[in-house]
Design a protein with these regions (language model features):
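A beta-strand edge to alpha-helix "cap/lid" segment located at domain peripheries
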Residues: 2-31, 36-134
Length: 134
């Protein structure tokens, strides 16, 4: 897999995890998240895999969505990739809030890529790009 192909694939996986339908499918979440997964949310709270699964299970559908943009992929090792990007919450009326800088560490387990670490940090508002891909 080339660097560009890997980056596109990891972005697709990251965006999948932002979708309510994916988050309600425990089998799919387990495919995407590493058993040792840890998240530090934008609130500063830490979550492990079990607490994230519980949160996702109890999540209610929403009329808004997460918009992601400005992706950058940095190879820490061939099997460890750091994905950086910005996100914002877009409500059903198109208003934006919860501007966040995000970082995700994806690891290749020998069989598949899994998200091992994710962190969201609040940031200043930024201009929303129409295209959210590379």
């Amino acid at each position: 897999m080339t660097g560009t192909t890997r980056m596109k694939f990891l972005i697709e996986q990251e965006v999948l995890l932002q979708q309510y339908e994916t988050r309600q499918n425990e089998h799919e979440v387990m495919r995407l998240l590493h058993p040792d997964f840890v998240e530090v949310g934008r609130s500063g709270r830490s979550f492990d895999l079990q607490s994230i699964l519980e949160l996702m299970k109890n999540e209610e559908p929403s009329t808004g969505k997460i918009h992601s943009q400005s992706f950058e992929c940095i190879a820490l090792e061939p099997s460890v990739q750091l994905l950086l990007y910005k996100s914002a919450w877009v409500d059903s009326k198109g208003s934006t809030s919860l501007y966040t800088k995000r970082s995700s560490v994806w690891v290749f387990t020998g069989e598949k890529w899994q998200l091992k670490y994710h962190q969201g940090t609040p940031c200043e508002p930024f201009r929303i790009e129409v295209e959210s891909t590379i």
